[in-house]
């Protein structure tokens, strides 16, 4: 059974598109469409993994954001305070005059950890976000 292909249009910053084109060239994709389909499949797989996080977990959320984006730093701080019962530590690094890198160390319920991660990753100005967790007992 052949799947119908849908044509879509997207807007990307030229630097991001340039990096993507370089990667798909190195990986040997026949077209941008092949690379984008693979990236979307990877994104869907990651989303499904995040939805399946259960039980007690330890982990980290690493993210890069534009601290000059109006209200973003305050929103990130408010979110972290709301989930302070999960947060054990955080590291904040100023990458340059515009971007910050932060790593938040977590310990608690997996569903809440995933919720915290998703709440932060969708904010406009968060450029990268990666949640990593492992199952653990509560004695950590």
From Swiss-Prot:
Cofactor entry: Ni(2+)
| Protein name as catalogued | Putative nickel-responsive regulator 1
Q: Does the keyword DNA-binding apply?
A: yes
Q: Which keywords does the record carry?
A: DNA-binding, Metal-binding, Nickel, Transcription, Transcription regulation
How is the cofactor bound here? Answer: Binds 1 nickel ion per subunit.
* Binding positions for Ni(2+) per the UniProt entry: 81, 92, 94, 100
Q: Name one Pfam family in it.
A: NikR_C
UniProt-recorded Gene Ontology molecular function terms: DNA binding; DNA-binding transcription factor activity; nickel cation binding
Provide the disulphide bond pattern. Answer: none
Database matches in CDD domains: RHH_NikR_HicB-like (cd22231)
Against SUPFAM superfamilies, the record matches this protein to: ACT-like, Ribbon-helix-helix
State the function annotated in the UniProt record: Transcriptional regulator.
